[in-house]
Regions:
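N-terminal cap/lid segment of alpha/beta-hydrolase-fold proteins
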Residues: 2-49
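Short beta-strand/loop motif that positions the catalytic acidic residue
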Residues: 210-212, 216
Length: 269
């Protein structure tokens, strides 16, 4: 496969493709060094291919929105999907650093732009394209299910931070302050802002599957349960799948937890 580097100086209609031999297609779609994504395409004919192309899963990594965590976390999943005939679009985005004071808008903008870039790629069936996110990436996936102009075929949220206010009060993350560092403020006195970015306050406009390990100590499964209950109260049904593993087995391609997720993806194709 090859890397295709998109020049940020060109319009979307006039993309210049520079081919560089690498294991995956790395696409730099913006001017910032984090505005890129890796495209994994099946090497063999896909059993899921139609005239429009192959279905694709956009992957959003976790790490409590911190810059030090990268898309490498989702690379094994991307490789596994491609081996099974499903394209993967593994994205990077703006994460917060210790000196930052709120980057949530940049993060969401990057994710939305990456989703938009996917529609420009040849060989992709954009109608059957999905979004899958883990942990903080699960939060972003749920937000995309609510705000994305082009709705995903399916949204899978793996151990998602589905209620950022509850996550902040529970001091989730190593330092306990990751949510408010990403937001740039505390929830008290900024309720409307936090509601804008909180999945539990923004019902999805597409089908959602919640995948959560009952042994998860990093993001408790009650995050998914509370979200599902809140959506039901709003008249929105989401699917819940409780898994036996923890926060990391859910992204371990050698685990039974991952096999369950692959079966769900296949069921939608």
């Amino acid at each position: 496969m090859f890397v295709r580097q998109f020049s940020s100086r060109e319009t979307e209609a006039e993309l210049h493709l520079e081919l560089v031999k690498l294991p995956v297609d790395r696409m730099q779609w913006g001017a910032e060094d984090w505005q890129f994504a890796d495209l994994y395409m099946p090497d063999e004919p896909s059993p899921y291919e139609k005239d429009e192309g192959v279905p694709c899963v956009m992957l959003i990594h976790g790490g409590f929105w911190r810059k030090k965590f990268t898309l490498d976390l989702m690379a094994p999943i991307a490789e596994d999907l491609a081996e099974q005939g499903i394209a993967a679009w593994n994205i990077e985005f703006k994460g917060w650093e210790p000196e930052d004071e709120g980057v949530w808008m940049d993060t969401l903008s990057d994710v939305m732009r990456a989703w938009g870039q996917l529609a420009l790629l040849p060989g992709i069936d954009i109608v059957r394209s999905m979004i899958l996110g883990h942990s903080a990436g699960g939060h972003l996936a749920l937000m995309m299910s609510s705000v994305a102009e082009r709705k995903p075929w399916l949204t899978i949220a793996q151990a998602p931070i589905a209620d950022i206010v509850a996550a902040d009060h529970a001091k989730l993350s190593d330092g306990g302050d990751a949510v408010r560092r990403w937001m740039g403020c505390e929830p008290e006195g900024n309720e409307e802002l936090w509601r804008r970015v909180n999945p539990i306050d923004n019902p999805p406009r597409t089908s959602v599957v919640l995948m959560h390990g009952k042994a998860d100590e990093d993001v408790p499964w009650t995050q998914s349960e509370s979200y599902a209950r809140a959506m039901k109260a709003k008249g929105v049904e989401v699917q819940k799948v409780w898994l036996p593993g923890d926060h990391y087995s859910i992204i371990d391609v050698a685990s039974d937890d991952w096999l369950t997720q692959v079966e769900t993806i296949r069921d939608w194709l």
